[in-house]
């Protein structure tokens, strides 16, 4: 077992010397021995709660992490932080809390580690914003760290087919259109979510789980095993052991997360037809380490990456199927073979990506993952857009779309509720471009996801017949011609705020353009008449967020990151 010089670790501030006798008394009160207190302290943070199935299995896995830490010479210190689960927050004001929770999770993890002087960190997360949040905290603190996903939910079974919660969201649209009875809707909702774990398709949680392996912060294969399976405890135990190895070798998150590894992460998102939210989270992670990696940098990777994974919502299969087919490492291997992955990036194994992938072979007998030279489509499932309607950019998920160009007339709504009411009453028509504005990071505040609205549109059979544009976000589960992250946002006087009903909009996902048929002078004239809307929040966390949040194309950061860092926590 390795020996550690505690005099060189942050925890010396809470455990060494006569003046720290009161601190040590607290540890003895919790059952730790003098030997335990003399060892490195490892924070074990999870986002466990009972809000939804996504995080319900995390406390169990945390116990296995702690066993791994102790077995390798460390003293684990478990703590929980919050999470807001999008599936519950969706479709009402609660969704304003979702993206904000990313910052609170990262900040609270930072404060806990700083306040108690932990030497290393293992983070376990199971829902959309908690995954990037813990990765952000890791690179911000820069103590040796390992991320581990809590695992995906098992698919439900309805009429002999695999289903996920997204089928229920879309069934709401079918029900409102008279295409599904209340009895059938109830049958579906009762079977769609049969276990613990995050939503089962290639939605945001599973997208960011793939990112955790591709970026190098998680152990190979750890993203794939479903939450209910005992194999998750094996990876949790190994993660606890791994973080101690990283501490011994002084391999830190900023040695792992680099421009190249961020490009690897964007590549896995594109290859899996993953969530557009990754284009928000990767720039936010980059901000923590002072790297410029914005929405359009992500989009460049998306444009040149083949789409290889036939996963829901654009494809046929769920996360469990990808795991059985060969998991993230097999997909990374074929991408590496095709020259799409940087092999020289360090990972938490203490080896490079190339070394990790050395003995992995592609299995051609499965149907979920394609080889790099036999893609579902030659470019990624997500495309960046720019034009006079989105000078800072926007993003659209094209995985599963049959048509990549759309021209139509604007139907403008100043919040999601107004748009949803229109959709529920079916007061829109084929060819409309539904605009949902004032839902950006500042305007929302909180940049809500629009799954309830897009799910209802798709359920009504209109998913390919209309387009939707917003300065808000979309769930990773969204289907249809939906453009999000449009900036500058309406609340800041961006072009979305200047649109009127009937304005003609052209979207071309092949060329990567999004424009309204208005001249510069017409837009300028409208801008002179525009007046900012008063926020519906004058105090509290949501108000505070709106005062500090940056633009979506930079990841909606709430602090300057490493650019203005004076000293990093790990070196205190």
Curated annotation (Swiss-Prot):
One Pfam short name: ILV_EDD_C
InterPro entries: DHAD_IlvD/Edd, Dihydro-acid_dehy_C, DihydroxyA_deHydtase, DiOHA_6PGluconate_deHydtase_CS, ILV_EDD_C, ILV_EDD_N, IlvD/EDD_N
Cofactor note: Binds 1 [2Fe-2S] cluster per subunit. This cluster acts as a Lewis acid cofactor.
Catalytic residue list: 475 (proton acceptor)
Cofactor(s) listed: [2Fe-2S] cluster; Mg(2+)
Keyword list, A-Z: 2Fe-2S, Amino-acid biosynthesis, Branched-chain amino acid biosynthesis, Iron, Iron-sulfur, Lyase, Magnesium, Metal-binding
Enzyme class: lyase
Subunit structure: Homodimer.
Name listed for the protein in its UniProt record: Dihydroxy-acid dehydratase
Taxonomy of the source species: Bacteria, Pseudomonadati, Pseudomonadota, Alphaproteobacteria, Candidatus Pelagibacterales
């Amino acid at each position: 077992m390795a020996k550690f010089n505690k005099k060189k670790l942050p925890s010396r501030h809470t455990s060494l010397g006569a003046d720290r006798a009161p601190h040590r008394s607290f540890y003895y009160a919790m059952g730790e021995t003098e030997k335990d207190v003399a060892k490195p302290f490892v924070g074990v943070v999870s986002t466990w709660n009972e809000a939804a199935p996504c995080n319900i299995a995390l406390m169990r896995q945390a116990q296995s992490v702690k066993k791994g830490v102790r077995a390798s010479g460390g003293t684990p210190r478990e703590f929980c932080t919050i999470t807001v689960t999008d599936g519950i927050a969706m479709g009402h004001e609660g969704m304003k809390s979702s993206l904000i929770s990313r910052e609170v999770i990262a900040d609270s993890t930072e404060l806990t580690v700083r306040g108690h002087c932990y030497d290393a960190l293992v983070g376990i997360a199971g829902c959309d914003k908690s995954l990037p949040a813990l990765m952000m905290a890791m690179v911000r603190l820069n103590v040796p760290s390992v991320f581990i996903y809590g695992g995906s939910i098992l698919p439900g079974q309805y009429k002999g087919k695999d289903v996920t919660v997204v089928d229920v969201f879309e069934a709401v649209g079918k029900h409102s259109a008279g295409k599904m009875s209340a009895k059938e809707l109830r049958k579906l909702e009762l079977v769609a979510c049969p276990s613990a774990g995050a939503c089962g398709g290639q939605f945001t949680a599973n997208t960011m789980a793939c990112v955790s392996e591709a970026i190098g912060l998680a152990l190979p294969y750890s993203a794939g095993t479903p939450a209910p399976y005992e194999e998750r405890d094996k990876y949790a135990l190994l993660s606890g052991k791994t973080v101690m190895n990283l501490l011994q070798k002084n391999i830190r998150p900023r040695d792992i997360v680099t421009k190249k590894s961020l490009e690897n992460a964007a590549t896995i998102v594109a290859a899996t037809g993953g969530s557009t939210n990754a284009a928000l989270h990767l720039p936010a992670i980059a901000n923590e380490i002072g790297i410029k990696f914005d929405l359009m940098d992500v989009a460049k990777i998306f444009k040149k990456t083949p789409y290889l994974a036939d996963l829901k919502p654009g494809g046929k299969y769920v996360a469990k199927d990808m795991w059985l087919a060969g998991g993230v490492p097999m997909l990374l291997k074929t991408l590496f073979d095709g020259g799409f992955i940087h092999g020289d990036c360090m990972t938490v194994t203490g080896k490079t990506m190339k070394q990790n992938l050395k003995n992995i072979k592609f299995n051609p007998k499965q149907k979920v993952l394609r080889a790099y030279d036999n893609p579902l489509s030659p470019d990624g499932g997500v495309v960046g857009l720019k034009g006079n309607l989105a000078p800072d950019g926007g993003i659209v998920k094209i995985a599963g779309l049959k048509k990549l160009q759309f021209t139509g007339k604007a139907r403008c709504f100043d919040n999601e509720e107004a748009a949803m009411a229109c959709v529920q009453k079916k007061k829109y028509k084929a060819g409309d471009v539904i605009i949902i504005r004032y839902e950006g990071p500042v305007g929302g505040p909180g940049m809500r996801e629009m799954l309830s609205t897009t799910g209802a549109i798709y359920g009504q059979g209109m998913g390919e017949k209309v387009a939707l544009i917003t300065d808000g976000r979309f769930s990773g589960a969204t289907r249809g011609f939906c453009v999000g992250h449009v900036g500058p946002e309406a609340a800041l006087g961006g072009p979305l705020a200047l649109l009127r009903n009937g304005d003609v909009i052209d979207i071309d996902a092949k060329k990567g353009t999004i424009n309204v048929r208005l001249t510069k002078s017409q837009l300028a004239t409208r801008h002179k008449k525009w007046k900012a809307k008063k926020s519906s929040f004058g105090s509290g966390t949501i108000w505070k967020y709106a005062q500090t949040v940056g633009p979506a194309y930079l990841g909606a950061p709430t602090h300057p990151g490493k650019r203005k860092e004076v000293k990093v926590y790990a070196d205190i």
